[in-house]
UniProtKB/Swiss-Prot annotation:
Disulfide bonds join 3-17, 10-22, 16-32. It comes from Phoneutria nigriventer. It holds the Pfam family Squash. This is U14-ctenitoxin-Pn1a. Keywords: Disulfide bond, Knottin, Neurotoxin, Protease inhibitor, Secreted, Serine protease inhibitor, Toxin. InterPro entries: Prot_inh_squash, Proteinase_amylase_inhib_sf.
Length: 35
């Protein structure tokens, strides 16, 4: 699955593309980021 160019909301790293991290300071506002 290709990585989306936009940051998408997530709950865990599994929601993100491979090699991306689920990051955020609040539980409701976590986003996928590329390392």
């Amino acid at each position: 699955m290709p990585c989306p160019k936009i940051l998408k909301q997530c709950k865990s790293d599994e929601d993100c593309c491979r090699g991306w991290k689920c990051f955020g300071f609040s539980i409701k506002d976590k986003m996928c980021i590329s390392r």
